[in-house]
Design a protein with these regions (language model features):
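N-terminal export signals and maturation junctions of secreted/periplasmic proteins
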Residues: 1-4
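Short helix-to-loop capping/linker segments positioned immediately adjacent to catalytic or ligand/cofactor-binding
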Residues: 6-10, 93, 115-120
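Soluble non-cytosolic domains of exported or imported proteins
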Residues: 9-17, 63, 96-101, 124, ...
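Peptidoglycan-targeting cell-wall enzymes and recognition modules
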Residues: 17-110
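Acidic helix/loop microenvironments that form the catalytic cleft of cell-wall polysaccharide enzymes
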Residues: 23-26, 118-139
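A generic secondary-structure signal for well-formed alpha-helical elements
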Residues: 26-30, 76, 110-117, 137, ...
Length: 159
């Protein structure tokens, strides 16, 4: 899947290293497909009760829980991804737990957050680049280690 994306998006080695590092960390090494917390915990913590998520009723908190490698949350994000992908995840939210659609959610996030620009910045200022891409400084050391490892491996592989 990543190979197809790198060709289609014409990504450089450092951009692929950044893309893969962010994906690896955010998806817990491709293991995360759905928020593990119970509906009761989600409701109690009011995790997705923010108006920015576009949820219109209490049931939406559970229905549009974090899913996919991009951890899409809320009716609004599900709708935006659905428009882009032409897969109706608003009607069928569980579709985001399918590997190919989950990966596609990551590609969508990459495009939404201008991943190429962030990846180019990563060589100069990884913290700023990663924070800009994810939206906050989360697990930066882990992201940096994976990025450097990817970069080393890919640079060695292309010689």
């Amino acid at each position: 899947m990543i190979d197809d994306t790198t060709v289609r998006e014409n990504l450089t080695v450092s951009q692929v290293a950044f893309f893969a590092a962010q994906l690896t960390v955010d998806s817990d090494a491709l293991a995360f497909l759905e928020e593990p917390w119970s509906p009761k915990h989600i409701a109690h913590q009011r995790l997705y009760d923010n108006p920015i998520f576009g949820n219109t009723c209490e049931a939406d908190l559970e229905r549009y829980r974090a899913r996919g490698f991009a951890r899409l949350v809320g009716r609004q994000n599900y709708a935006a991804f659905s428009r882009w992908s032409r897969i109706d995840c608003v009607k069928e939210p569980e579709a985001l737990t399918e590997l190919s659609i989950s990966y596609l959610s990551w590609v969508w996030l990459w495009k939404q957050r201008d991943g190429k620009r962030c990846a180019d910045l990563a060589l100069k200022d990884f913290v700023r680049a990663s924070t800009a891409f994810i939206g906050w400084p989360d697990r930066l050391t882990e992201r940096y280690v994976v990025f450097q490892r990817n970069l080393e491996h890919m640079t060695r592989s292309t010689r």
